[in-house]
Amino acid sequence: LQNYSEWKKKKFIAEKGLFWQKDGEDGMEISIGGHGFRVTINSYMAAEAATLSKIAHWKNDNQAQALETEACRIKENMFKYLWDPKAEFLKVLSVEKNASLKDVRELHGYTPWAFDLASADYAVAWKFLMNTRHFFAPYGPTTAEQCHPQFKVAYEGHECQWNGPSWPYATSMTLVGLANLLNNQTQSFVDSRDFITLFSIYARSLYKKDANGILTPWIDENLNPFTGDWISRTMLSTRHQKPEERGKDYNHSLFCDLVINGLIGIRPSEEEELDVNPLIPEGYWDYFC
């Protein structure tokens, strides 16, 4: 509760009933959408309030209802103010008065699905995920849509850019959201083949290739979505900037959870039961039953 209260003191704007954040402090530097009311922070805080409400309920704490109400209001305001009906996507809104939504779709727009915050009315947003004009790439998905004029994959400037490169953290959150969508809602925009395609790309990305072409299992910071090169690592090495291996074993991914909870589909429930719903298309593996 103290953590939630501190965030509310510092980042909550009552006029909109939403939290705001700088993109860099959101862990997403040099983004196209930039600072403002972001889908990320509001998804995190709505989910935290909902979780605290459940814990309070189990403890017979009288704060349970207030926290549940707060979680619902954050969720409602997020879709009220950050959903662009024309673009069919959630976007960043600047904190300035009379501001318009930023003109870019960014991968973090899928964050609400990672916490089961989005209703079926918004599933249309997923039609952009596997589209090469938007997010799909050989080592993607990209963190910003590729059709935007500010999309780029740069080897200059700041090492950590969220204006195009693929980030395993963002990919992980997107895959969690996709698994939740496929398990909990009926829609026609994505299916289990899309999940396994994206998950296979994610798994294939977690390597580095040496000068002799030998692949080594590897987790680092951000990826070139078209070549699979670890961008920050290459930039630091080229600049001889210490520590050159600062990104090694970067703890930003959910690989095991995605295999167990998503791919194999072992999903716990509050009823002390396990639901099993594999996201492996029929006939995809001849050794899976």
PLM feature spans:
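Alpha-helix capping and helix-loop boundary segments enriched in small/acidic/polar residues
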Residues: 32-43, 62-69, 99-103, 158-165, ...
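Solvent-exposed, flexible loop/coil residues
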Residues: 23-24, 32, 43, 87, ...
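Aromatic-rich carbohydrate-recognition surfaces in CAZymes
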Residues: 1-19, 38-46, 102, 106, ...
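Extended, well-ordered alpha-helical scaffold segments
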Residues: 1-9, 48, 52-80, 120-135, ...
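Extended glycan-interaction surfaces of carbohydrate-active proteins
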Residues: 3-36, 76-166, 207-239
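Well-ordered alpha-helical scaffold segments within catalytic/enzyme domains
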Residues: 43-62, 111-122, 172-189, 258-267
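Non-catalytic C-terminal accessory modules of carbohydrate-active enzymes
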Residues: 130, 134-135, 160, 177-289
